[in-house]
Amino acid sequence: MADISTVQMAVTEIARYAGRMIELIESLPEDQLWSTGCGIPNSIGTLSRHLTGNLNHYFGAGILKNGYVRERDKEFTETGLSKAQVLSDLRDAVNVAKAAVEAIDEAQIDKPYRSPCGQEYESLAYHIVKLATHLALHVGQADYATRCV
């Protein structure tokens, strides 16, 4: 049985992994943000855009009901944004995730949860832990990709 501390720990991990993604982006020259290599089809810029959209969609639209509308296809096709913009957007998305956790009604944590795209989860806590692992996966890809660009 999960409680608010489980959710808070998951969001702490989200912030930690997002911090690692920010470090990776900051370490790249501007012209390498959108480069691919090592057989990874997505650039670090694209991975960051995807994570930004994911956090805004599930925490912003899903939990906060803030009206965010995800354009998932653009996360993979919209390239050429500046490094500063990509970093700013990712930082803002992490803040949305943190705000969402603060807004969660503790009584909802162990109840079944339907995501904004209609997927059913056994609980809101499980869904948030899943979001943390999704972020970790893509940050790992980005970490690997920095060695190839």
Could you describe each region identified by the protein language model?
Residues 11-15, 22, 30-74, 115-149:
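Short, contiguous alpha-helical
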